[in-house]
């Protein structure tokens, strides 16, 4: 038994498999950052930080008794991992139904928890999480951000400018276009005055993937050349057991992670109108 304590849960192997399948499917669809940044891990639950390769000189120095020698001290810089955890509750009646062969058990709480933790990870990567010591891509690359047009029929022109920004900085492709929920939906619905789908025009401008990212505000054009953005995971998404009563089983979905922007020049944030107003 490990710290997840799954062996203590009154859940059959078949029900556990169904729970894992639902969680995995939702995570696969919802997660966007892992499709465009470098992934390091999983390093394990005991991984606590990432070495930054730098040190800080300390003003206070330990004294060597009986010696005139000077002892210098430097503290190594690290970036700590943060823990993300989403609790959820399943009805025992539904879990028992799975064991009896039901294929329509209510596992919506699993889906909701997986969606929540996936969006939390993506927001930390794309928009940062100051309390956790994480600078997001949008923050690190804000100097060269572009504003999305009020009419997304003009989106291809903005994309051309964003591609030019990356190439002018010597950033090679392939490139990926990460689209927030609203931008993605509007691009799907927008056509040019001649009736041509804007999304098809966008796809002709570059060969990279268009990625739906519900955790992103606006959009981002990101190089996938590698080495610029690093997501480090200690424990990858895991489901653990908390407790249970006669009616319910209380579980949680957990991971530990951090993120570093090593080459902020490799992304161009495309801000929505509300974001542009905030930055002005």
UniProtKB/Swiss-Prot annotation:
A Pfam family assignment: Linocin_M18
Keyword Cell cycle assigned: no
GO biological process, one term: iron ion transport
UniProt cross-references to InterPro entries, sorted A to Z: ENCAP (IPR007544), Encapsulin_nc (IPR051429)
Keywords annotated in UniProt: Encapsulin nanocompartment, Ion transport, Iron, Iron storage, Iron transport, Transport
Any one of the GO CC terms: encapsulin nanocompartment
Entry annotated with the keyword Repeat: no
Main location: other
Subcellular location: Encapsulin nanocompartment
Subunit record text: This encapsulin nanocompartment is formed by 60 subunits; monomers form pentamers which assemble to form shells. There are 12 pores where the pentamers meet as well as 3-fold axis channels and dimer channels; none are larger than 3-4 Angstroms in diameter. The N-terminus of the protein is inside the shell, the C-terminus is outside.
NCBIfam families from the UniProt entry: encap_f1
UniProt record similarity statement: Belongs to the encapsulin family. Family 1 subfamily.
Function: Shell component of a type 1 encapsulin nanocompartment. Assembles into proteinaceous icosahedral shells 24 nm in diameter in the presence and absence of its ferritin cargo protein. The center of cargo-loaded nanocompartments is loaded with iron. The empty encapsulin nanocompartment sequesters about 2200 Fe ions while the cargo-loaded nanocompartment can maximally sequester about 4150 Fe ions. Does not have any detectable ferroxidase activity.
Protein name: Type 1 encapsulin shell protein
Organism in which the protein naturally occurs: Rhodospirillum rubrum (strain ATCC 11170 / ATH 1.1.1 / DSM 467 / LMG 4362 / NCIMB 8255 / S1)
């Amino acid at each position: 038994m490990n710290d997840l304590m799954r062996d203590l849960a009154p859940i059959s192997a078949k029900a556990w498999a169904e729970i894992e399948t639902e969680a995995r499917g939702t995570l696969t669809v919802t997660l966007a950052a892992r499709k465009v940044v470098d992934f390091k891990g999983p390093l394990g639950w005991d991984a606590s930080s990432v070495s930054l390769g730098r040190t800080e000189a300390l003003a206070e120095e330990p004294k060597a008794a009986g010696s005139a020698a000077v002892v210098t001290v430097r503290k190594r810089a690290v970036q700590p991992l943060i823990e993300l955890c989403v609790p959820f509750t399943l009805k025992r009646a539904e879990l028992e139904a799975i064991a009896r062969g039901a294929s329509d058990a209510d596992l919506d709480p699993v889906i909701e928890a997986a969606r929540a933790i996936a969006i939390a990870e993506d927001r930390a990567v794309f928009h940062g999480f100051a309390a956790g010591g994480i600078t997001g891509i949008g923050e690190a690359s804000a100097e060269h951000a572009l504003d999305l047009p009020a009419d997304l029929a003009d989106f291809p022109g903005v994309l051309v400018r964003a591609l030019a920004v990356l190439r002018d900085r010597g950033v090679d492709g392939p490139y990926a276009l990460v689209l927030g929920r609203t931008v993605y939906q509007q691009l799907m619905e927008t056509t040019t005055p001649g009736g041509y789908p804007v999304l098809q025009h966008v796809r002709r401008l570059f060969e990279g993937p268009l990625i739906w990212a519900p955790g992103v505000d606006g959009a981002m054009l990101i190089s996938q050349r590698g080495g610029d953005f690093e997501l480090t995971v200690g424990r990858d998404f895991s489901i653990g057991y908390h407790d249970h009563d006669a009616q319910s089983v209380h579980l949680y979905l957990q991971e530990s992670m951090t993120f570093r922007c090593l080459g902020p020049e490799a992304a161009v944030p495309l801000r929505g109108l509300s974001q542009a107003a905030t930055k002005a």
